[in-house]
């Protein structure tokens, strides 16, 4: 049982990207699409959401083997000013009791690192954007099994993680010259992926066209 909390505006595209990755496993996986209860989507119809998604309130009594929290295009907003931040706090606390392992992506990773570990983020002078070579720091991590030693990973973010605020309760798993990419709890219950393993071959091009308008 895997849950996907989809915070992205284009929910159909994001769910397809993650479904493609999850579908590559030989295991039989049941994917539940989840959305924030308190937030009204401007880019996905309510009919679509009611048909294919459940709110977090509707799934919070369930147990999940894995839970994915996506990014969100709100990098410029302080965490506490995000409209659905209180619900995010409840969800992050809930993952500690109802989820075996959680993966946080991009903004989701920044938010969870801030909440659980007090990790600070810094606004970059320019947006980190493109496909960059990365370094595997911990080759023994089960999360990185089958990954090359120097993977090329899509990056699209305005903020960077303050390395000095990363404490001993976290382990750096993947690093790069463009910044930290992946960290994990020492207990192995959560991983924080600051870039975009889910992006397809059009994602960066479409973001570029959006940004230059």
Task: Name each model feature, range by range.
Residues 47-50, 82, 86, 155:
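Conserved phosphate-coordination/catalytic loops
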Residues 69-138:
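Cysteine-nucleophile active-site neighborhood
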């Amino acid at each position: 049982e895997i849950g996907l909390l989809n915070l992205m505006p284009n929910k159909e595209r994001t769910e397809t990207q993650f479904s493609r990755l999850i579908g590559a496993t030989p295991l039989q996986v049941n994917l539940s699409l989840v959305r924030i209860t308190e937030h009204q989507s401007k880019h996905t119809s309510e009919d679509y959401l009611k048909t294919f998604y459940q709110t977090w309130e509707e799934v919070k009594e369930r147990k999940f083997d894995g839970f994915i929290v996506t990014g969100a295009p709100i990098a410029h907003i302080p965490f506490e000013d995000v409209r659905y931040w209180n619900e995010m706090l409840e969800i992050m606390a809930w993952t500690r009791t109802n989820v075996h392992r959680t993966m946080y992506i991009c903004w989701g990773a920044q938010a969870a690192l801030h909440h659980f570990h007090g990790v600070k983020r810094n606004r970059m002078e320019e947006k980190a954007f493109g496909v960059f070579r990365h370094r595997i720091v911990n080759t023994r991590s089960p999360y990185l099994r089958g990954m090359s030693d120097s993977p090329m990973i899509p990056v699209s973010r305005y903020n960077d993680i303050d390395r000095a605020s990363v404490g001993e309760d976290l382990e750096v798993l993947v690093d790069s010259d463009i910044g930290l990419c992946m960290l994990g709890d020492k207990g192995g219950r959560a991983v924080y992926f600051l870039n975009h393993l889910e992006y397809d071959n059009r994602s960066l091009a479409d973001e570029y066209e959006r940004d230059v308008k």
